[in-house]
């Protein structure tokens, strides 16, 4: 068992994956406290070479999908194989502060669980502020996750995710928005006003497909 499972799904983003994993090497929480489950969702690409570089420094499990399943199905596969008390998703083209895992897990240690079940501070998930960075890693702008939601970088208690039912695989985009909406119907999500996550903006971001985004935004509104 681990305190944290870090879930990373990679599809045609190998060029960014080294930076993502490197940001997890020197976390201020011991490496024995967290595992990384990396899903390769591109059958035509191999990630073993990347994993081998970090295998002495990180507890990585690589799962190769036999066919492209899409992000929500891959995230659910990670959750089904998780051994962590907490779960956090990091996108393969993003990276995090060295204090990211410690700060978010410590907050949940102090503010979730049956011992404070009647407290207004009882949270089953915590997000943090983030920086947008360009494809070279240069800072562009700071954002509040509370005001400008992103689906990655949120740490959940595993039990609460089991309760709400993981990701809806019908949502090939906006899967995080759909899941967090269901999650907030039952549980609190707190936002730490600390920019611990780096959200990379580049030419192949999934959200660049505005027609797809708008289509699933309409689906979200229709499914209310």
PLM features: what roles do these ranges have?
Residues 199-202, 208-224:
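Catalytic core of nucleotide-sugar-dependent glycosyltransferases
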Residues 25-63:
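Acidic donor-binding segment of Leloir-type glycosyltransferases
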Residues 172-179:
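Acidic donor-binding loop at a coil-to-helix junction in glycosyltransferase catalytic cores
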Residues 99-139:
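Conserved donor NDP-sugar-binding/catalytic core segment of glycosyltransferases
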Residues 65-82:
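Glycine-rich, basic loop-to-helix element that forms the pyrophosphate-binding segment
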Residues 13-26:
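Short, well-formed alpha-helical segments that are part of the catalytic scaffolds
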Residues 129, 190-196:
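Catalytic beta-strand/loop signature of glycosyltransferases that borders the donor
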Residues 87:
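Short aromatic/hydrophobic "clamp" motif used to bind/position activated sugar donors
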């Amino acid at each position: 068992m681990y305190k944290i499972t870090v879930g990373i799904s990679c599809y045609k983003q190998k060029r960014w994956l080294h930076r993502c994993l490197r940001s997890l090497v020197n976390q201020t929480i011991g490496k024995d406290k967290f595992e990384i489950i990396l899903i390769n969702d591109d059958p035509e690409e191999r990630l073993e070479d990347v994993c081998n570089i970090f295998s002495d420094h990180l507890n990585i499990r690589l799962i190769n999908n036999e066919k492209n399943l899409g992000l929500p199905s891959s995230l659910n596969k990670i959750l089904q194989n998780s051994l962590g008390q907490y779960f956090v998703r990091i996108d393969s083209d993003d990276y995090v502060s060295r204090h990211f895992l410690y700060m978010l897990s410590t907050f949940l240690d102090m503010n979730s669980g049956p011992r404070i079940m009647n407290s207004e501070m009882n949270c089953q998930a915590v997000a943090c502020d983030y920086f947008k960075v360009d494809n070279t890693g240069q800072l562009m702008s700071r954002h509040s996750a509370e005001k400008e939601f992103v689906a990655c970088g949120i740490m959940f208690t595993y039990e609460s995710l089991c309760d709400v039912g993981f990701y809806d695989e019908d949502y090939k985009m906006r899967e995080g928005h759909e899941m967090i909406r269901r999650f907030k119907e039952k549980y609190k999500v707190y936002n730490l006003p600390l920019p611990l996550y780096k959200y990379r903006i580049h030419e192949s971001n999934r959200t660049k497909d505005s027609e797809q985004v708008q289509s699933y935004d309409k689906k979200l509104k229709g499914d209310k």
